[in-house]
């Protein structure tokens, strides 16, 4: 399995320790856990942005005029099978660095862990996961915790 991550950094306040994380390796590990397939090629965009930018997207696409931590815009519809080896573009994950910094500080964990947690959450949404109720939210949070542990990160205790 191959996962190509197109990293877009639109938040100049993010430290290099976050932007230089091994995103492709992490997403490949997470995909193998959640949707194990041999020979598949995936692509996605991970955009790290500001509260102002994510608020504009949240207003435009969700009619919510407030910043949020993560948005996911899936492109997967499954209507047409792709030839083996052709990349499947999963969609875009947008994370607010501003909100991630606040949440990390409030919860007492690192910014890297917070952004990894949000990136994994976004990936699950790209793959069709949702949390319309408490049971599905618990299932999703459990999967996120397992994904972070698989790449050697300690999941945020307050979020599990």
UniProtKB/Swiss-Prot annotation:
Function statement: Single strand-specific metallo-endoribonuclease involved in late-stage 70S ribosome quality control and in maturation of the 3' terminus of the 16S rRNA.
One Pfam family matching this protein: YbeY
Annotated localization: Cytoplasm
Cofactor binding note of this UniProt entry: Binds 1 zinc ion.
Keywords linked to the UniProt accession: Cytoplasm, Endonuclease, Hydrolase, Metal-binding, Nuclease, Ribosome biogenesis, rRNA processing, Zinc
Known EC number: 3.1.-.-
Gene Ontology MF terms in the entry: metalloendopeptidase activity; RNA endonuclease activity; zinc ion binding
Gene Ontology biological-process entries: rRNA processing
HAMAP family, per database record: Endoribonucl_YbeY
Cofactor(s) of this protein: Zn(2+)
A GO CC term assigned to this protein in UniProt: cytoplasm
Gene3D superfamilies, alphabetized: Metalloproteases ('zincins'), catalytic domain (3.40.390.30)
InterPro entries: MetalPrtase_cat_dom_sf_prd, YbeY, YbeY_CS
Ligand binding (Zn(2+)): 121, 125, 131
UniProt family annotation: Belongs to the endoribonuclease YbeY family.
Protein name from the UniProt record: Endoribonuclease YbeY
